[in-house]
From Swiss-Prot:
It comes from Escherichia coli (strain K12). The lineage of its organism: Bacteria, Pseudomonadati, Pseudomonadota, Gammaproteobacteria, Enterobacterales. Mn(2+) 2 binds at residues 80-81, 164, 222. NCBIfam families: PhnP. It catalyses: alpha-D-ribose 1,2-cyclic phosphate 5-phosphate + H2O = alpha-D-ribose 1,5-bisphosphate + H(+). This is Phosphoribosyl 1,2-cyclic phosphate phosphodiesterase. The keyword Manganese applies. Mn(2+) 1 binds at residues 76, 78, 143, 164. Its EC number is 3.1.4.55. InterPro entries: Metallo-B-lactamas, PhnP_MBL, Phosphonate_metab_PhnP, RibonucZ/Hydroxyglut_hydro.
Amino acid sequence: MSLTLTLTGTGGAQGVPAWGCECAACARARRSPQYRRQPCSGVVKFNDAITLIDAGLHDLADRWSPGSFQQFLLTHYHMDHVQGLFPLRWGVGDPIPVYGPPDEQGCDDLFKHPGLLDFSHTVEPFVVFDLQGLQVTPLPLNHSKLTFGYLLETAHSRVAWLSDTAGLPEKTLKFLRNNQPQVMVMDCSHPPRADAPRNHCDLNTVLALNQVIRSPRVILTHISHQFDAWLMENALPSGFEVGFDGMEIGVA
């Protein structure tokens, strides 16, 4: 069975359009909703199971009815990646497994008052675990809070989800070089910069990383309005694409 990944959000905490900004990218997004960007998140479908990657969307309860998905897979506990959990936890129904890094603090009072969310499913770096037949490997990332990317594998597919990060730790880079993903969804918040940014990648960083990893298809996510404005005037190299909210990626 094929693996399907849908990008439900491709922006950062600021979103696109950014409040009060009149740059070309923000003006375009106000005119045309297809250019809007919500918090970085995704949906993985495999073996009739649905996994939600991160929970930054405000309308999760409207998008998903009880029992319509199996679990959350969190990259980290910054607010723009978990804010949708706060109202959802007070719902009625069966417990919902939440897989994620062993962050002792979490976010605000989520751990103290989890409601129907089951946060006991902490994962460890490079230790493979199974989600309804999907093999998942947590990959340490470079961010201001404990953050994991994930390599998602089936018998025929290999997809990497790498957000939020500034570059990659050496062990993660080596692992991806030796386990080349067919598709790599990669944090790229910034246009090319002379200096390497903190917490998120710029385009120069992503290009350099893929010279090592050599994924044939790189899809950029966590896009800022500044990068969108740059993209309106510049083209990406072959093999690189800009993700958009609602983008569906099938990997046979």
